[in-house]
Amino acid sequence: MKPQSKILIIAGSDSSGGAGIQADGKTVTALGSYAMTAITAVTSQNTTGVKSVVPIKPREIEKQIEFSCIDIKPDAIKIGMLHSTKVILSVIKSLKKLKIKKIILDPVMVAKGGANLINSSAIKTLKSKLIKQTFLITPNIPEAEVLGCLLYTSPSPRDDR
């Protein structure tokens, strides 16, 4: 029997279960791997929108990462919502200690409606420091545009002009 892969998920918690830690954990488990987590924020949301976001302090995030990995070393890391520059820098600090090569970043920065979910300073830090350490980035179209990876100029399918 093949040994089970261990994935550390660093992301926000979605009370509806449709995104964030909950969705990532379900995906990892469905793929036959073991999910460990470090929660960066707690959100109150449902399918229609986000009501509130309660950030977790950077030091608490570091502790979650550190203690999760003391006895179970992850084979890969999946990163989602990092809501501030301080949190991004804190996660980078933790990643350096772990020395994991397979880091997947879903840069949760821009809502489906186009609103920024993190400030410009955090976006700058993500672009200049975190992306360099990742193996794979999975932005949506608005996030890819913010990162400078894509300039989307085609009209949307709903644009009937």
Residue ranges: model-predicted function:
Residues 1-76, 132, 148, 154:
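Small-residue (G/A/S/T)-rich helix-start motifs and N-terminal tracts that mark the onset
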